A protein has these predicted regions:
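Ubiquitin-like/PB1-type beta-grasp interaction modules and other compact soluble beta-rich domains
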Residues: 1-6, 60
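Short alpha-helix capping/helix-loop boundary micro-motifs
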Residues: 23-26, 36
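Short, structured beta-strand/loop micro-motifs enriched in basic residues and often containing a Trp
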Residues: 10-23
């Protein structure tokens, strides 16, 4: 599944990033690499997603979220 399909409050593990190299490198600099845990904090109607990665909150657009493949992990209660 893609990060865009994720549910608010759930944790996911990044399996693969299928984006152009420039965007992929930027995400890696922000700490998002294969195996990283990502928690979705908000999913805006516009398509942008606010998430927490390695203790840092940031937002990404719909196109980027659709290029990040994840596997569902533990739920945040």
């Amino acid at each position: 599944m893609t990060l865009r399909q994720g549910t608010i409050g759930n944790k996911y593990q990044v399996k693969e990033i299928q984006l152009e190299d420039k965007v992929k490198r930027r995400l890696q600099m922000l700490g998002m690499t294969k195996g990283t845990e990502v928690r979705i904090l908000n999913n805006k109607k516009s398509g942008s997603i606010i998430m927490k990665v390695r203790g840092t909150r940031f937002a990404i657009g719909r196109r980027i979220a659709e290029g990040i493949l994840v596997e569902e992990g533990a739920y945040e209660q």
